[in-house]
């Protein structure tokens, strides 16, 4: 299978090379097209106010735009015959409605879906096992071969410690973090602000955050034009391929 790999962490992401090696080891042709620098939290941002440029960096193509721009150039110029787009693996999970729709990783996958190419966004909690990550992504690729009809993209989140479950998400957590506004004063006497906050300790059952943080499961989310979409067959197949002891799909 010919696969475009992109991300929102740029060409120096520690998870990019292992992912590419893993996909190539099982016979896939991989074309890497990524933003030239980290573009986390870019969502579906696109570039319209300046020219886009592509250059080679080793074996990768790098783009001076957002993750969605990288996918657009990949599918329109560099690899128009790609059969699948994998966005990630993101360094850090994308859980909850804000992270899902604000994520450049997920945004890139949605861009591929809008262009008619099946796509998978993959994110892993910091400290996760790279070998397990590759196993999950390879399982997702095999599951996608059966088709992803009715969805623009599938978003998969991999916990740092897996307790054996795969959960198909039907509801996103509304607020994963207790964000607040922090105010400071710079050396010139001008005010500045940071938005930040700790993760919540409790989540509503049956949300992606509950399955991820409490059940420590791999979560599978289908995204369509109308929001959350069913990916039950995909989730069941993925669970089978990675040896899950519980599949809730």
Swiss-Prot record:
Tell me which cofactor or cofactors this protein depends on.
a divalent metal cation
- Subcellular location, in the record's words? Cytoplasm
Q: Where is the signal peptide?
A: none
Domain of life, per UniProt, equals Archaea
Any one GO molecular function term: metal ion binding
Provide the binding site for a divalent metal cation: 8-9, 40, 90
Q: Which GO terms describe its cellular component?
A: cytoplasm
Q: Name one Pfam family in it.
A: SurE
EC numbers listed for it are 3.1.3.5
Cofactor comment text: Binds 1 divalent metal cation per subunit.
What Gene3D superfamilies does the record tag this protein with?
Survival protein SurE-like phosphatase/nucleotidase
Catalytic activity reads:
a ribonucleoside 5'-phosphate + H2O = a ribonucleoside + phosphate
InterPro entries recorded for this chain? SurE, SurE-like_Pase/nucleotidase, SurE-like_sf
| Keywords assigned | Cytoplasm, Hydrolase, Metal-binding, Nucleotide-binding
Give the protein's biological function. Answer: Nucleotidase that shows phosphatase activity on nucleoside 5'-monophosphates.
Q: Which HAMAP family match?
A: SurE
- Similarity remark: Belongs to the SurE nucleotidase family.
Protein name stated in the entry: 5'-nucleotidase SurE 2
Q: To which species is this protein native?
A: Pyrobaculum aerophilum (strain ATCC 51768 / DSM 7523 / JCM 9630 / CIP 104966 / NBRC 100827 / IM2)
Q: Which gene encodes it?
A: surE2
